[in-house]
């Protein structure tokens, strides 16, 4: 029987399945961080349980840490408690932790692939909604809640219902200047933020295959923003080249055997998908969100839609509420919108490729007078090290940007990087919800190049009109 890639991954990890019951899956890799793990470890202690397979769980510090200092003792309040708890819990159980004193530390969804912990064919979970990032490698990866974190620590398994399969094909090649971020925002704009609900999405097509692994991670990272359980891209030579010689990747004969298996991880030609969506790559322009969910997005050269022209009453009400919060009116040209801050970072766009794209725009230019701050936050210590080796940090600093240490930073208002009230931000992160970047902050999601351009021109511009240095 023909199967989709998702079906192959799911079926190969079933530990137990019975009629009328939710299947139990084996979990190959468990990633943890300081925010969603403390209660899980507390639960283990109360029940007098041990971590079942210590060598399959890895931790990092990312969400609540400061990107300005590397000293735990200088953290305050809840952030300090969370970081110290993670350190205590990993030491007590023997779990490997990449803490803020090591260059391997980073945002969990940057650190995992970078270390070769993310491999094709795996099941990967983490107490974080953007775990779908790892699906870029042909792994079944999804976010879980704190009680499930405890369950995986205790059993290395998880109850998981079968999802539907969706195929999203992006045909042909994108135009110059169009990035993975534009592709995924255009997809969400077409499907809406609920279009993938109940599905695991496989992204395919020439435009997807042309992406680097960094770009593929950006696409899968935001699968959750269209309501999907997970996102997948079948592994290929690009995947294998990225993984070869990574610290935790197989070596020698094991590598050869692994690649031979990984090459089988693709949907069968006659596999049936529950839902199929198609986009033409040539039609995708630079994207900018105008509202308060990632599905409220248009091309930079378009005007903000009129809610009164929307047939769906729910969509209309959502748009009206979004425009009121975001402080914009229907018919406004996106290129007339000025920004107060710029954030380049997050698990969506903080890898070396993203920083290179931003630096190419900012080189030889200065922060616009109306822009209060440009934050550039690498996704890991290794990304930071590579960027500094290439001199990217000097480009950012010369332009008037702040070059920070690794962390989630202004993606979410959980640390000391936040927007002021009603400030408008061009952000490379993945969510533009109300208050996401700080109380009453206004977020517009864009690619790294578009964010950098907004920082030096003071407003949104079409990156295709910008000369790169």
UniProtKB/Swiss-Prot annotation:
Taxonomy, superkingdom: Bacteria
Keywords attached to this entry: 4Fe-4S, Amino-acid biosynthesis, Branched-chain amino acid biosynthesis, Iron, Iron-sulfur, Leucine biosynthesis, Lyase, Metal-binding
Enzyme class: lyase
InterPro entries in the record: 3-IsopropMal_deHydase_lsu (IPR004430), Acnase/IPM_dHydase_lsu_aba_1/3 (IPR015931), Acoase/IPM_deHydtase_lsu_aba (IPR001030), Aconitase_4Fe-4S_BS (IPR018136), Aconitase_4Fe-4S_dom (IPR036008), IPM_dehydratase_rel_enz (IPR050067), IPMI_cat (IPR033941)
Residue pairs linked by disulfide bridges in the UniProt entry: none
CDD domains: IPMI (cd01583)
Catalyzed chemical reaction(s): (2R,3S)-3-isopropylmalate = (2S)-2-isopropylmalate
Pathway: Amino-acid biosynthesis; L-leucine biosynthesis; L-leucine from 3-methyl-2-oxobutanoate: step 2/4
GO molecular function: 3-isopropylmalate dehydratase activity; 4 iron, 4 sulfur cluster binding; metal ion binding
EC number(s) recorded for this UniProt protein: 4.2.1.33
UniProt cross-references to SUPFAM superfamilies, sorted A to Z: Aconitase iron-sulfur domain (SSF53732)
Alphabetized Gene3D superfamilies for the sequence: Aconitase, domain 3
Coiled-coil intervals: none
Residues bound to [4Fe-4S] cluster: 347, 408, 411
Cofactor notes: Binds 1 [4Fe-4S] cluster per subunit.
Annotated GO biological process: L-leucine biosynthetic process
PROSITE patterns: ACONITASE_1 (PS00450), ACONITASE_2 (PS01244)
Keyword Iron in record: yes
Cofactors, names only: [4Fe-4S] cluster
Pfam families in alphabetical order: Aconitase (PF00330)
NCBIfam families: leuC (TIGR00170), PRK05478.1 (NF004016), PRK12466.1 (NF009116)
Protein family per UniProt: Belongs to the aconitase/IPM isomerase family. LeuC type 1 subfamily.
Subunit organization: Heterodimer of LeuC and LeuD.
Task performed by this protein: Catalyzes the isomerization between 2-isopropylmalate and 3-isopropylmalate, via the formation of 2-isopropylmaleate.
Record's protein name: 3-isopropylmalate dehydratase large subunit
Species annotation: Haemophilus influenzae (strain ATCC 51907 / DSM 11121 / KW20 / Rd)
Phylogenetic classification of the source organism: Bacteria, Pseudomonadati, Pseudomonadota, Gammaproteobacteria, Pasteurellales
Gene that encodes the chain: leuC
